[in-house]
Amino acid sequence: MEEQVANAIEIAWNPSSDQALKAQAFDYLNQLRTDPSGWQVCLALFTKTPQHSEIIRHVALEVVNSAAQAGLIDPQALGYVRDGLMNYLRQVYGQENANPDPPNIQNKIAQTITFLFSALYGSGWESFFDDLLSLTYKGASSTSPDNMLGIVFYLRVVNSIHDEIGDVLVSRSRTEQDRANSLKDLIRMRDMQKIASSWQQILSEWRDGNDLIVEMCLKAVGSWVGWIDISLVVNQTMLDLLFQQLARAQKAELRAGEEKVRDAAVDVFTEIIGKKMKPEDKIDMIIFLNLDTIVSQLSNSPPLCENRFTFKYDTDLAETVAKLVNSTVVDIVRALEQENISAECREKANGLLQAFLPHILRYFSDEYDEVCSTVIPCGSDLLQYLRKVSKTDPSLTAQHSPILLPILKAIIAKMRYDETSSWGDEDDQTDEAEFQELRKRLAIMQQTVASVNEQLYIDAVSEVVATTFENLRQSGAQLDWRDLDLALHEMFLFGDIAVKAGSLYTKNQPNNQAAERLIEMMSRMVESDIRSFTHPATQLQYMEICVRYSSFFLYHTNLIPGVLESFLQLVHHPTKKVKTRSWYLFQRLVKQLRSHIGNVAQTVVQALGDLLVIQAEIPTEGADGDEMSSEDHEGSADAVFNSQLYLFEAVGIICSTPTVAADKQVLYVQSVLNPVFMDMEKNLAPAKSNDERALLQIHHDIMALGTLAKGFSDWMPGTSSPTSLPAPEVSEAFLQVSEATLVALESLKTSFNIRTAARFAFSRLIGVLGSRILPQLPRWIDGLLTQTSTRDEMALFLRLLDQVIFGFKGEIYAILDTLLTPFLQRVFAGIADPTTGTDDEIQLAELKREYLNFLLAVLNNDLGAVIISERNQPMFDTVITTIEHFAKDIEDFTTAKMAFSVLSKMGSSWGGPDIAPEATNGASQQVALPGFAQFMISRMSPLCWALPATPSFNPKDAQAKQVLAEAGGLQRTIYCKTGMEYIQYLRDQELPGMGMGGELIEEFLNALGQLDLKGFRQFFPVCTAR
């Protein structure tokens, strides 16, 4: 069988094997993993002499591991595995061996041995560490660990055991953690002293003999120190050995691999400091270890001092030392935050903080961002501590300036692009993203500095910005773009303390001193020659700042023309990223300054003309794949068009300013509209033939037309009817837009994209056409709600129609009367369509709710008569039936609750005047619909009991209670409209028919007659729960 398993492994992992044979081999091996006796064959395969090939031995041992972890090997058999492996280890690792196992096999054996440790160390292999330590000696006569192979394997297992039971980053179940804690206790009790002694012996014996052994040993010390007695590591013998390894940092040249030993030695000190202990003990430990001196010596070592700013600079060591600094300062600050530490400890901690401040600044200002990022946590903790102290005692703020100012200057300096950066280079997108992420972290630290000492922050940033603009004035385009970008970035962040409620001003005065300074900065920036902003990054920053602080221009209107001119240059920028972003920023700027722009429409339309040409591009295959980066997406055809829409909106905004005469508005609008109309006409025929590019072109055209309308009026339907429509001649021009869109929609209504664009245009045209659009409403509905329209589309259009009803309730009755029946028939068809998945069900629920919302909009806006008009009377019963169905839906409480709301509103609208004593439902009184009172009693009232009568109904469910409260509201409405007739019906028919007892019936009727609406809504859910 051994030969059979070996052959199967060879076939499975041989690239040239026949695929069918390979599949059989894998099936066989998978069966072997679950076979209770399979591990025995594989253990024999692994330990066999002469040895099988590496892949056979690796897979064989993997099967043994798998069986052990799956519980296929009982404790007695685990002892057999232990004995077999230990015999193998003594043969191969217990003596000099010319052909040692490769690292992957060593790791696999260590993994198996670690599992056996977990299973048997408590009971069955108490001599575990003695057995492994025996491998580190060549023979009985050896007085110190002298067997290299055995030492490496021993350390491999020691590190593996830490990973298994000591690593705090590994997620464990409660049971696993309890077992790990138990094993750690046993180690501490039985073997920890001899393990620590073995480390000392190995480091002493091999300190210069084998870098791999020393590195592995240091890693073991560093990882185990967190959960063992600290004195086993922090003692003079061990510290001397550690300092010997740290001395490697002073070498100008290291042999290959030696740097790993040096870094591992530094990591041991970091782990010692990271060990949990009382604040006083931690501060004393930092002083005892003389970490300030250690860090100073490391910082002044050749790799970090002489080689700094050269290609030889050792970033790995810099990052390793930065971790030590970070860990130490975090603990110093943590001690200072404790209110109950002694005055002596606080004094020591403050002294350490002063000593470590240069170290923080050294690594924080390191030119490599990964080094800087390593000390950001401790810098943030320090600043948070200073903020807390300054709030408790403001008088200490000035004392902290010597700490704060150098940190703030370091933060600002680190915000600057370094000399090697090349902004916008496609090859550096990852670096750019990482730098922007670093800037965000630095900005948070900067805000904390400002919260500790705002004046210090204001002065520091003001100085940087003022100096930069002065240099710009003197040297112009010769100024390094990185310096200008830094100043602009700081200006952008400065608004966090200067801007209040979106403005720099309150009651025509600057908000505060920060706002005053920022206004000065803005003046310097805007009055600078834009041609000096030669780099795309600074040009983009310029626009972002103008938009963020647009309130500045409201008080400096003389500067607006110059800024507009700058923007009109930048919207033609050759860099796509800058150009497309500038289109959005231009729209934002003109929207915020709409009333102060002046009559510049002709200039703007002419300047933007070439950018308003719409060029639809079919997305290339795979453009939607997961591999597309955000940068790629910004440059995609779809993203570019979406940015282009901002230009159309900007044109609408500028052309509709009060300073532009109505006839000129029409002229400018027509100059934008006519090319789009011509393009639509040209593409309509091929689009009808399903030409993909033509369809997309018309989609883009319609979106552009709708967006232009949006620029003219930012009124959104649903707020109120447009209070200031454009001049009649302008509205007439947009009627052409509506007509052109409808023509395209009527021809291409089977296209989802065309319907989507048309729905958007419709919503925007309302704002410029007002009630003029109402006569076209039937055509819009016919085009937007087709046989192929999704439920989602119907729901969106219903929501839009609600807003139209609200905005034009005085003028829409006749049109609504004409279109209601065919419109609702399409909605009912959408509701009736079967669902095929979760997405369908979600869309169906949304459509139901929007349908009920539509009915409520009609009723709430005094248009209820349209539902029962002569034209729509035949549809009325279907309307009621759907509402009844929704009211009984136990799967959708939200819809059920709305259904009861609609029924209550119908009762209020058509039930006639209130006749019950003291009935006050707040509804406007309307003429009674003949027969509706009886209809409410016979059809609506029984619905209130349908849900609670359902076997699966849970009256304690929060949503269920809300539905029942709404049902109670309906009953109260019926009572208000019908009075004693309803009471009599309930007493004689409905309640007894449900099996309700006489006493409960009287209690229910008393509550209905005596409680107000709110009281009965609360009573009904309680009543049904009995």
UniProtKB/Swiss-Prot annotation:
Main location: nucleus
Phosphoprotein keyword on record: no
Location of the protein in the cell: Nucleus; Cytoplasm
Gene Ontology terms: biological process: tRNA processing; tRNA re-export from nucleus
GO terms assigned for molecular function: small GTPase binding; tRNA binding
InterPro entries for this protein: ARM-like (IPR011989), ARM-type_fold (IPR016024), Exportin-1/Importin-b-like (IPR013598), Exportin-T_C (IPR045546), XPOT (IPR040017)
Domain of life: Eukaryota
UniProtKB keywords: Cytoplasm, Nucleus, RNA-binding, Transport, tRNA processing, tRNA-binding
GO CC annotations on file: cytoplasm; nuclear matrix; nuclear pore
Chain segments annotated as coiled-coil in the UniProt record: none
Entry function: tRNA nucleus export receptor which facilitates tRNA translocation across the nuclear pore complex. Involved in pre-tRNA splicing, probably by affecting the interaction of pre-tRNA with splicing endonuclease.
Matching PANTHER family: EXPORTIN-T, EXPORTIN-T/LOS1
Family: Belongs to the exportin family.
Protein name: Exportin-T
Lineage, opening ranks: Eukaryota, Fungi, Dikarya, Ascomycota, Pezizomycotina
